[in-house]
Amino acid sequence: FTDAAKTLVYRTGQVAPTVAWRAGGYRLPTEAEWEKAARGGPAGLRFPHGDTITHADANFYSDAAYANYDFSDPRGYHPDYDEGALPYTSPVGAFAPNGYGLHDMAGNILEWCWDWWSGDYYSTSPYLDPRGPETASSRALRGGAWRLDAGYLRVVDRNNNRNPSYNGGTSNRYFGFRVARSAAGE
């Protein structure tokens, strides 16, 4: 996109070889960093803004199966972004930021993390600052997406790119990324 307010949708396999990920300390966040950022402060909340979610909070697919914490009306794709042309992403800043001032930590697009994916990694990882397994077949994804239900938008929910074709040069309407920056000296 040429408009900075638009959400970047990652074209798998095209960005990584051309980006100097560590230049100036910029990189993808680890899963632990991503989760801390998504919480926006208090631990223990289900979503970045509280324990319930509606279309006023994020861009996602509302499903009645999650009615105990998804209070959206109407159900289905977000009514403001279901325009008939995929992807149904929303502009950056369309929803209120979390406690750290970060937008779209739930919904809109799944975000790549630096960590390799392992479904049981956190059962054996270090308690402080886990960095993910050494290798795996795919990277971890966090945050949910415009086409996913509220269960995927929970701060603790972990995903990976289960479709092997997304590890190649395939474009994808559901994945994106946000950059983190290491503190001086890290």
Where on the chain are the PLM-derived regions?
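Functional-site microenvironments in short loops/helix caps that host divalent-cation chemistry
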Residues: 1-162, 171-173
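Short, structured beta-strand segments at or near domain termini in extracellular proteins/domains
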Residues: 171-186
